[in-house]
Amino acid sequence: MAECGHGYRSQRWEAENWIGHRYPFKVMSFVELQAQYIREGRLNLDPTRNQKRVTFHDPCNQARNGGIVEEPRYILRNTVMDFVEMEPHGAENYCCGGGGGMLSMTEFASERKAAGKAKADQILATGAEIVATSCHNCLDQLDEVKRHYKLKVKIQNLSELVANAIVWPKPPESEESSQEAEEKK
């Protein structure tokens, strides 16, 4: 199970080379698992809990390399009221500029900010109030792009929107609680 695009890529395609044998299981992205749980009805969701307009930034390692394009959109269609696509999107979406280790190299901050201009323009064109993504490197880079270009958006992990939409079942009332309620009447 991998949360971010970079973790997914390293676990899905590279780790078996390092450990010298194939995994006896399928490596999944957390996005794939969330979509699976929604399809199976294992999550009770209320999209009205996410009213603001949301757009999605496709992490390069998930969309381009992993083909994980429909899953985040399926999740958003089930967790938010107003989802709008960036153009282009999916495997053609613009890179945020934070991948390839660039985010951790402060000496390349100006290059990252310059690369983020296309992403800032892309975000603005959607009119979204929230930019969701499913990679922590992208999350940090998009937050930096937001600050640098003074974008009036909130950057959130896709999982935060899922968590906000979950309708948790009420715990069963204990027999003692039922008796106490009756006594108070």
What is each residue range found by the language model?
Residues M1-K185:
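Iron-sulfur cluster-binding electron-transfer modules in prokaryotic oxidoreductases
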